């Protein structure tokens, strides 16, 4: 269904003309058509606002701790959706969004001023978050193969890791903005490389629930026991 989002503080329509977005509002007689992939014009499934409204009716908004149901729901989702087993509540942490989780993980693995490996093209949220927190970005460009498919350049990745003394990487799976759903062999080879050079991996998997038919998301942590121990996977329900 088509929603009128004007006046609801939606960046997709109310921020036209703001820095970093569309240069200005449409001319008179023309409509703004939201086509932002990261903020699709789909209504939220009714059960979610219903649950929020029901909770908001209670007047206490003090400190809280996650419930057992919260942890069980996440564990069940990963088991049934992604085939990840063995998760416990101790494996799960809450962060203020994926980018907050990325930075928090890097703050554990790295010191300010350290070099962090990212693939390019790079999601601008990574760029701003890492630079604003004092990390240096080392890009390893993705390359197109003979079928015009974006692939990781493993030789370039290894050279960048060694030359720049990289010990942490931000990995995007599925990749934003290229849209690649990585195949198992690609993930295995990347994680073997990270293991070889003791690189910790922060894997942004926020897009894993929006995948075209014929493809399957494989969680980075699931490709080996070593990958499980060196990967921090970050998810959010905000895309779906």
Q: Predicted regions span which residues?
A:
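N-terminal small-domain helix-loop-helix segment of the aminotransferase-like
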Residues: 3-97, 104
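Short, solvent-exposed coil/turn elements at secondary-structure transition points
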Residues: 5-8, 38, 98, 143-145, ...
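Short, active-site-adjacent cap segments at secondary-structure transitions
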Residues: 42, 208-209
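Conserved core of the PLP fold type I
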Residues: 57, 61-192, 209-210, 214-226, ...
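Residue-level marker for buried hydrophobic side chains located in beta-strands
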Residues: 201-202
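Walker B catalytic acidic pair
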Residues: 205
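PLP-dependent aminotransferase class I/II
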Residues: 230-240
């Amino acid at each position: 269904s088509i929603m009128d989002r004007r006046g609801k503080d939606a960046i997709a329509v109310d921020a036209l003309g703001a820095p970093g977005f569309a240069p200005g509002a449409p001319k008179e007689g023309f409509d703004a058509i939201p086509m932002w992939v990261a903020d699709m014009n789909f209504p939220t499934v009714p059960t979610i606002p219903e649950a929020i409204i029901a909770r908001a009716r209670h007047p206490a908004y003090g400190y809280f701790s996650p419930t057992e149901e919260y942890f069980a729901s996440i564990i069940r989702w990963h088991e049934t959706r992604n085939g990840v087993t063995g998760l416990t509540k101790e494996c799960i942490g809450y962060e203020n969004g994926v980018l907050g989780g990325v930075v928090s993980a890097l703050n554990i693995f790295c010191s300010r001023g350290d070099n962090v490996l990212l693939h390019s093209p790079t999601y601008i949220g990574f760029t701003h978050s890492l630079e604003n927190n004092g990390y240096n970005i080392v890009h390893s460009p993705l390359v197109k193969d003979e079928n015009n498919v974006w692939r990781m350049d493993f030789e370039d990745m290894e050279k960048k890791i060694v030359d720049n003394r990289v010990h942490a990487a931000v990995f995007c799976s599925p990749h934003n903005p290229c849209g690649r759903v990585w195949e198992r062999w690609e993930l295995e080879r990347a994680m073997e490389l990270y293991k070889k050079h003791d690189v910790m991996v922060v894997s942004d998997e926020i897009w894993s629930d929006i995948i075209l038919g014929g493809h399957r998301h494989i969680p980075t942590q699931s490709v080996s026991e070593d990958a499980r121990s060196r990967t921090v996977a970050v998810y959010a329900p905000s895309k779906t």
